[in-house]
């Protein structure tokens, strides 16, 4: 199974013309993130056959030079967003490595699908592209990973992500969940949750190689 087949199946099942027309107008008349060529970067960097872990985000960062198509990741020269900083703090506490760069392309290439449930946003307007059709698309992506793969780790931070559990066959996949790494909630159970080591422990238990969560050249 490849993304091209999954995309074909989804677009055959659902009509995304209204969303397509909306995005054409938005990209023509407003500043929208990420750049059009990066909307699907999560799928470009993580082929379907390589998926070991799925980390769900919500919508892209809405500031300049941030979003580039991977959930939680920002472009190399951008400031660290607070949630990502907390993710790295937990990573250091969990498995002892310190990451210096704010982009997560190496995770994507390791087999971590960094999937936002909404893939575009207007500059400065969080959630501005919610309910235009992206949720239907990404729900189908989650279901496809659940249906066609085995032994994938789904890391679900916060209530919106955890609402997607209903799309996942929990009998053949691993669910790791906690509150969101946002500063508003991180101290209520994200810190100390050890998602990275838990994911690797599970992957090794089913005969898969672990994720290299530490810094790598990618």
From Swiss-Prot:
Pfam families, A to Z: UDG
Keyword Cytoplasm assigned: yes
One Gene Ontology cellular component annotation held by this UniProt entry: cytoplasm
Transmembrane segments: none
Active-site residues, record numbering mapped to chain: 59 (proton acceptor)
InterPro entries for this protein: UDG_fam1, Ura-DNA_Glyclase_AS, Uracil-DNA_glycosylase-like, Uracil-DNA_glycosylase-like_sf
MF terms in GO: uracil DNA N-glycosylase activity
Stretches of the chain forming a coiled coil according to its record: none
One GO-annotated biological process of the protein: base-excision repair, AP site formation via deaminated base removal
Enzyme Commission code: 3.2.2.27
UniProt catalytic activity: Hydrolyzes single-stranded DNA or mismatched double-stranded DNA and polynucleotides, releasing free uracil
Entry function: Excises uracil residues from the DNA which can arise as a result of misincorporation of dUMP residues by DNA polymerase or due to deamination of cytosine.
Protein name: Uracil-DNA glycosylase
């Amino acid at each position: 199974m490849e993304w091209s087949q999954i995309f074909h199946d989804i677009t055959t099942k659902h009509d995304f013309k209204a969303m397509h027309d909306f995005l054409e107008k938005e990209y023509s008349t407003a500043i929208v993130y990420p750049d059009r060529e990066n909307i699907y970067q999560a799928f470009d960097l993580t082929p379907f056959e390589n998926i070991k872990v799925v980390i769900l985000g919500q919508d892209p960062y809405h500031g300049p030079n941030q979003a580039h198509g991977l959930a939680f990741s920002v472009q190399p020269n951008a400031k660290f967003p607070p949630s990502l900083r907390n993710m790295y703090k937990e990573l250091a506490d969990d498995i002892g490595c310190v990451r210096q760069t704010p982009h997560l392309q190496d995770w994507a290439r390791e087999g971590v699908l960094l999937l936002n449930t909404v893939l575009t946003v207007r500059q400065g307007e969080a959630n501005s592209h919610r309910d235009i059709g992206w949720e239907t698309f990404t729900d189908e992506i989650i279901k496809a990973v659940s249906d066609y793969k085995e032994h994938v780790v789904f890391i679900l931070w916060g209530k919106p992500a955890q609402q997607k559990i209903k799309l996942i066959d929990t009998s053949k996949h691993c669910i790791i969940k906690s509150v969101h790494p946002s500063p508003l909630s991180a101290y209520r159970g994200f810190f100390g949750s050890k998602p990275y080591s838990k994911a690797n422990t599970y992957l090794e238990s089913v005969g898969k190689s672990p994720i290299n969560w530490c810094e790598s050249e990618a």
